[in-house]
UniProtKB/Swiss-Prot annotation:
Its cofactor is [4Fe-4S] cluster. This is Phosphomethylpyrimidine synthase. Substrate binds at residues 193, 222, 251, 287, 307-309, 348-351, 387, 414. Zn(2+) binds at residues 391, 455. It comes from Bacillus cytotoxicus (strain DSM 22905 / CIP 110041 / 391-98 / NVH 391-98). Residues 38-59, 92-114 are annotated as: Disordered. Residues 92-102 have a biased composition (Basic and acidic residues). Belongs to the ThiC family. InterPro entries: ThiC (IPR037509), ThiC-associated_dom (IPR025747), ThiC/Bza_core_dom (IPR038521), ThiC/BzaA/B (IPR002817). NCBIfam families: PRK09284.1 (NF006763), PRK13352.1 (NF009895), thiC (TIGR00190). Binds 1 [4Fe-4S] cluster per subunit. The cluster is coordinated with 3 cysteines and an exchangeable S-adenosyl-L-methionine.
Amino acid sequence: MEQSVSAEQIELKSSLPGSKKVYVEGSREGMKVPMREIELSDTNGVPNSPIRVYDTSGPYTDPEYKVELEKGIPTPRRNWIIERGDVEEYEGREIKPEDDGVKAASNHTPVFPQMDRKPLRAKKGANVTQMHYARKGIITSEMEYVAIREGVEPEFVRKEIAEGRAILPANINHPEAEPMIIGRNFHVKVNANIGNSAVSSSIAEEVEKMTWATRWGADTIMDLSTGKNIHTTREWIIRNAPVPVGTVPIYQALEKVQGIAENLTWEVYRDTLIEQAEQGVDYFTIHAGVLLRYIPLTAKRMTGIVSRGGSIMAQWCLYHHKENFLYTHFEEICEIMKQYDVSFSLGDGLRPGSIADANDEAQFAELETLGELTKIAWKHDVQVMIEGPGHVPMHLIKENMEKEIDICQGAPFYTLGPLTTDIAPGYDHITSAIGAAMIGWFGTAMLCYVTPKEHLGLPNKDDVREGVITYKIAAHAADLAKGHKTAQQRDDALSKARFEFRWRDQFNLSLDPERAMEFHDETLPAEGAKTAHFCSMCGPKFCSMKISHDIREYAKENNLETTEAIEKGMKEKAKEFKEAGSHLYQ
């Protein structure tokens, strides 16, 4: 088994080209909110102001930070948590070999060699969720941090959390995480799924995927590991993750019963929840809406039940002919969640896995139950978001958003795409980004990325990059459509740079500067091409923007308005044509 992960084992890159890490200070000492500042060149001697953008990359892009993965990243939130006075350290549960799928203790690797702190939990009778604080009228340090990142007032953040329209996923045992918010009145967020399988990947690879995904803009990470070393892989990811980490606890619980769904018990699952909460998982996908009576509704589907968690619980329900134990024990789950401030991501175990099954009775029956469970969670002041489909054609997407807002009382929606067609394996990052942009516009708060490997295999780091960038495009397009007050600043800056032929600024303002520069340099690699007033698409004679510049220059020289310049130029060209004999070809 693997002993540790070092910075030398994975590729860690500095900040993106033309950018630098900057920090905005909050009201309390030591609160530093990260931003990425993109420096811009002058336009004919007139300075262009730098553009600041949201940054998810954590300390890895700070040139003053020394990466030591075996120690984990800094824990700025720990003091905030302790100062509130409502938590206590305790010994925590014993880490067992079976947590990593190992039978003998002699084969078990130490989980995280330099972990020297005990887990935290709420003191007896206390509730430590951000929703609980918000409902008491308290603006926490986390809420202020989020307000600075989003460019809004802290009171607005508090109110959105208190009313359930947004969540701030921040387990008290994940102090490494930089606070962020998920809600339809904030920037649309992107989640990246990582995790090993029974046949592929290592701890080092998964840690690298995490740092890689956050570099390109992933707002949260889900560790969906189903292979060996589940506990240890998760520990290394969380200790080094600057963003919230989510999981599907039923996957690990299933490993503890040797992969036999019918052998699952509430006791095994409960133990797994506590194990992961003590590690610092920020949100759990829990498929508590897959009820026994809904399973027959999937019988006539084209693709049945495609959710792994949903199919596991359906199999358990049918084998025992009992109601889903996640549903029957939901109040007890809430009691665990509020001790650590773990947020619910209520799973859509009956989501459609094909266009043929979109918006069917099974899907919406489960959604009704998720609405019921949302009310129960809110009774405990536990934060909730709702997971959504799936495979949905464009004309049926809006109905999903409208039903979710109505049935789940406006809780944030978190969707996988949706994929808008089933005919493009290898390109499902595109088929799903179409749906993601639409549903983000309609109100979805977070989009779960899809990589080119969807339906085909486990994604590697290049697939992760492709998936994140594709979904950042969808999320930004949704922000523009919703009229988010700061969304268009970057578009306008890039458009201005494009019109002024500031090529390097164009590259640096893009979501993937390295790819933009690479494509440009394939045909025009010379340094002089970075200042040329054309690209290889049109060349120097047919560049529309160069022609526009020429028209403006002509108008300026002749003291004309642009429209007058065009008319005058047209008349002059017509005169030249007639004087040359009116021949089409000279």
